[in-house]
Amino acid sequence: MHRALCALGEEKGYGHFADQVGNTYLYRQRYSMDEPYWLVGSHLDSVIEGGRYDGVAGIIAGLLVMGWAERDGVDLPIRVGAMRCEESSNFGRSTIGSGLITKEIYKHDVGEAVNKQGETLHEVFDRKGYSLTPDRIQGIREYLELHIEQGKVLEEYGDAVGIVSTIAGPRRFKVHVHGNAEHS
């Protein structure tokens, strides 16, 4: 999906690059890479049964804003970011792509996470040429992420839009229970 996003960006005349953990960014080429920018994006991976437009809606929203700015000549240094391993149903740990580049997650937190094929995240990153110790992302003025609702709160209240400033950080645990199932 990241390659397809890059190809779409090229069709539209946008530049693209991947950071040290494989997150993909599209940008308007008229702006210096050193100039502060707004980052709009989300992720392209999803959890099983996560919803058809789970993270993709945020990527499309960023592309629409960037296209509007380009078409109307609006002075808006914007990048669209597609983070990797945000849901990470493969490694049992979420927000890896964004966490590593913001220094909210460190190598020792995730490097030994194992996927369904028995590979550690460290091994996968080594094979792909990514780093578990990337530089901290720089230059972001603000970050905006459009996302699907993951519950029914808006629907129950009859609201079309909800705005949040933080989310609950998910934690997963593996638990082994020893004993007998003798009561429901």
Regions found by a protein language model. Name each.
Residues 19, 77, 132-136:
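Flexible, glycine/charged-enriched surface loops at secondary-structure junctions
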Residues 40-43, 49-89, 173-177:
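Alpha-helical metal-binding/catalytic segments enriched in His/Glu/Asp
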Residues 85-184:
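Midchain, well-structured core segments that form catalytic/ion-binding scaffolds
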